[in-house]
Amino acid sequence: MKILVDENMPYARELFSRLGEVQAVPGRPLPRELLVGADALMVRSVTKVNANLLFGSSVKFVGSATAGTDHVDDTWLNANGIAFSAAPGCNAIAVVEYVFSSLLMLAERDGFQLRDKTVGIVGVGNVGRRLDTRLKAWGVKTLLCDPPRADRGDAGDFLSLETLVRDADILTLHTPLYLDGPYRTHHLVDATVLNAFADGRILINACRGPVVDNAALLEALQQGKKLSVILDVWEPEPGLSTDLLARVDIGTAHIAGYTLEGKARGTTQVFEAWSEFIGTPQQIALSSLLPEPDYAEVTLTAPVDEALLKRLVHLVYDVRRDDALLRHAAHQEGEFDRLRKHYQERREWSSLHVICADVESADCLNALGFNASVRGAR
């Protein structure tokens, strides 16, 4: 069997070569001629998978090592007998930690305590749910908005977007991109919503670029709107507005989910789905793939406060690195994709063992996602 894998999918060659002949291919653009004789195609979010790409091909299975699937026309795949599997939740932890790192950076810069803020989370799926849990573990009040879950009667105190815009100090977006229908999220944050924000609010988009009307956001900022903005995703990509980038507080190249652990989860999830599809199911232990982190252990001599938490978080990942890289490169054609293709290795907080001086700090850090223990207990 011939299996095409995105050249930037970690561990793909190593894993899929167990089950067939592997050929690494570019994700954007992916020339149709490379599909000749292929049985399976493994992609990332940069590849548009639809009739234009696959009509008349021999591909029987498509795997996307991503949580989102708006780049895949799964309706067409199903109608044409092509199996499809994605990797829901694979990068959720990475996105949560990106948001946390960004907020701690703004808190230090602007002189506030994150615990004193109310965070409105729009979209309570794999990312939003985990973010809610970690924020609460740090003592942050959260407000939740998720109309589909509210209408289904899911457990949770769900509020309207209007309520979050009114009452939350920070609004962070974690929805799928729906272009139409009752739960449309395309331009969910538009000029009307932006005008409703009180001065000093923080807006974060780390889901899909068009969930925020980028033109309306740029206009609002140009007109002096006092809004701190964190954008990891843009409208459009890769050709983002450099004028908008110049006005946001943190801007990155759609890399919020790009931890080594998140990428490895995505690859292993689609590998396991493919192995099931061909009748030779295999399970992969993530730990068997990952290397030792650059920083494996640190010892604390004081209880954890917000300043110390920021130092721990930024020891593992400091968002300012990626912000600086995008600002330096954004004016050059092709650099957005190059930053993603050659992304520097980044780990999750769980890769860092924190030896604490007290039980309360260890419990708190474990709840936040670190690997923590009390001195002498391990």
Swiss-Prot record:
SUPFAM superfamilies: Formate/glycerate dehydrogenase catalytic domain-like, NAD(P)-binding Rossmann-fold domains. Transmembrane segments: none annotated. It catalyses: 4-phospho-D-erythronate + NAD(+) = (R)-3-hydroxy-2-oxo-4-phosphooxybutanoate + NADH + H(+). The active site is at R208, E237, H254 (proton donor). One of its GO terms (cellular component) is cytosol. Its main location: cytoplasm. It is found in: Cytoplasm. The keyword Coiled coil does not apply. Pathway: Cofactor biosynthesis; pyridoxine 5'-phosphate biosynthesis; pyridoxine 5'-phosphate from D-erythrose 4-phosphate: step 2/5. Substrate binds at S45, T66, Y258. NAD(+) binds at D146, T175, D232, G257. GO terms for biological process: 'de novo' pyridoxal 5'-phosphate biosynthetic process; pyridoxine biosynthetic process. It comes from the Bacteria. GO terms for molecular function: 4-phosphoerythronate dehydrogenase activity; NAD binding; protein dimerization activity. InterPro entries: D-isomer_2_OHA_DH_cat_dom, D-isomer_DH_CS, D-isomer_DH_CS1, D-isomer_DH_NAD-bd, Erythronate-4-P_DHase, Erythronate-4-P_DHase_dimer, NAD(P)-bd_dom_sf, PdxB_dimer_sf. Keywords: Cytoplasm, NAD, Oxidoreductase, Pyridoxine biosynthesis. PANTHER family: FORMATE DEHYDROGENASE 1. Homodimer. Catalyzes the oxidation of erythronate-4-phosphate to 3-hydroxy-2-oxo-4-phosphonooxybutanoate. Belongs to the D-isomer specific 2-hydroxyacid dehydrogenase family. PdxB subfamily. This is Erythronate-4-phosphate dehydrogenase.
